[in-house]
Amino acid sequence: MRLVVCLVFLASFALVCQGQVYKGGYTRPIPRPPPFVRPLPGGPIGPYNGCPISCRGISFSQARSYCSRLGRCCHVGKGYSG
């Protein structure tokens, strides 16, 4: 019996770690933050806004700042949108 309880616990823990479990009994998945990528150092600068055109080389907080202040958000493999 203890073995079954232990295996069930480990399986549920693995699902939580993989983000495949639903929280609170709802049928929606646990939200994950959007993936931000880093711009290349010394990369091109967008006109009139000071934002790098590439999304590589910037920190997560810089990417969030660009998104909130300037309406330009980094997306993996797509550069900025907005």
UniProtKB/Swiss-Prot annotation:
Q: Which UniProt keywords apply?
A: Amidation, Antibiotic, Antimicrobial, Chitin-binding, Disulfide bond, Fungicide, Pyrrolidone carboxylic acid, Signal
All disulfide bonds of the chain are C55-C73, C67-C74
Residues the record lists as Serine amide modifications: S81
Pyrrolidone carboxylic acid: residues carrying this PTM: Q20
InterPro entries to which the protein is assigned, alphabetical: Penaeidin
Give compartment(s): Cytoplasmic granule
- Example of a GO biological process term: defense response to bacterium
Task: Determine the domain of life of the protein's source.
Answer: Eukaryota
The residues the entry assigns to the signal sequence are 1-19
* Location (main, coarse): cytoplasm
User: Which GO MF term does the entry hold, naming one?
Assistant: chitin binding
One GO cellular component term: cytoplasm
Q: Which Pfam families match?
A: Penaeidin
Family that this chain belongs to: Belongs to the penaeidin family.
Function per UniProt: Antibacterial and antifungal activity. Presents chitin-binding activity.
Protein name from the UniProt record:
Penaeidin-3h
Its lineage opens with: Eukaryota, Metazoa, Ecdysozoa, Arthropoda, Crustacea
